A protein has these predicted regions:
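Alpha-helical protein-protein interaction modules
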Residues: 1-160
């Protein structure tokens, strides 16, 4: 995440203003997980899910916490919940692609990034900035998706 102190400071402000804000909870879970405070991240996200049970971001975040905690079966259950829900409700592709990126499934990550582009999701334009996707930026498949979308040069300033 870079400057952890600054990230925590800003995240605490966001959560103080809106304790159930899904992106603030997601970022807080990343901070806690990076600090190996898995139980705290789990508790935070379970409360977030109880407060907003329809929130797919908290489900994804909890699955990633479980994965990084070594609780693979629980992580896979969270992923299955998201995939099941995606059959009868709209779950943004960035949520699923970030989950796959965090658990190291490169093929599925690329598949869902392509799906985001096909769906013309706005989050496609900013996904490359997420810390879990940084390792994909030099991937041939990743570069091809953004070049085919006609936005590679604008997003990456020809740094490749």
């Amino acid at each position: 995440l870079g400057n952890m102190h600054l990230a925590e400071k800003h995240n605490n402000i966001a959560l103080s203003l809106s304790p159930s804000f899904q992106w603030a909870l997601h970022l807080r879970s990343i901070i806690l997980t990076d600090q190996h405070k898995f139980k705290a991240a789990e508790d935070l996200l379970i409360q977030g899910i109880m407060d907003d049970p329809d929130n797919p971001v908290s489900l994804m975040s909890l699955g990633v916490v479980y994965w990084k905690w070594g609780r693979k079966e629980q992580a896979q259950n969270q992923l299955l919940k998201l995939l099941h829900r995606s059959h009868f409700e709209y779950i943004k592709g960035d949520i699923i692609s970030r989950f796959y990126a965090a658990i190291g499934d490169n093929e599925k990550t690329i598949q869902w990034i392509k799906e985001m582009n096909n769906r013309k999701e706005m989050s496609f334009l900013i996904l490359h900035n997420h810390p879990w996707l940084k390792s994909f930026q030099k991937s041939e498949d990743f570069i091809k998706i953004y070049k085919n979308a006609g936005i590679f040069e604008e997003l990456f300033n020809s740094n490749f």
